[in-house]
């Protein structure tokens, strides 16, 4: 079973307030987002997280689309640093796909000007 968690207390400060998907059957944790020390989608054994306290995050899984139609939502979870590194080292990110005006595109296929524009429009200093 997969459980979503937010780590609220940990010996490793990089884990504080990070979000993970725990797979109890495999004994693995997949990083959704962390301040540092762990990459997005990195899978680690649960015991590598050390002594932690967490709160469960409700997850809704719908096995099928309703009869009246479905909704589609694409959410990109990225850090500014990831896109900036992709600009400098595109060979490290051949599969990096982002949403631009409702379309999915490979970040590396954009011109440098478009890449800068995406970074500027996507990330703000505050809400």
From Swiss-Prot:
Molecular function in Gene Ontology: formate C-acetyltransferase activity
Q: Does RNA-binding show up as a keyword for this record?
A: no
Q: Which UniProt keywords apply?
A: Organic radical
**Glycine radical found at:** 102
Q: Which residues form the Glycine radical domain?
A: 5-127
One Gene Ontology cellular component term attached to this UniProt record is: cytosol
Q: What does this protein do?
A: Acts as a radical domain for damaged PFL and possibly other radical proteins.
Q: What is this protein called?
A: Autonomous glycyl radical cofactor
What species does this protein belong to?
Enterobacter sp. (strain 638)
Taxonomic path: Bacteria, Pseudomonadati, Pseudomonadota, Gammaproteobacteria, Enterobacterales
């Amino acid at each position: 079973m997969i459980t979503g968690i937010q780590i609220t207390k940990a010996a490793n400060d990089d884990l504080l307030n990070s979000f993970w998907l725990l797979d109890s059957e495999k004994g693995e944790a997949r990083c959704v987002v962390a301040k540092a020390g762990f990459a997005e989608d990195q899978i680690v054994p649960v015991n590598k997280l050390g002594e932690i306290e967490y709160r469960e995050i409700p997850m809704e899984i719908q096995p099928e689309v309703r009869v009246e139609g479905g909704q589609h939502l694409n959410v990109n979870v990225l850090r500014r640093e990831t896109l900036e590194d992709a600009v400098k080292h595109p060979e490290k990110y051949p599969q990096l796909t982002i949403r631009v005006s409702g379309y999915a595109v490979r970040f590396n296929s954009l011109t440098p000007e478009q890449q800068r524009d995406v970074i500027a429009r996507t990330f703000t200093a505050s809400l």
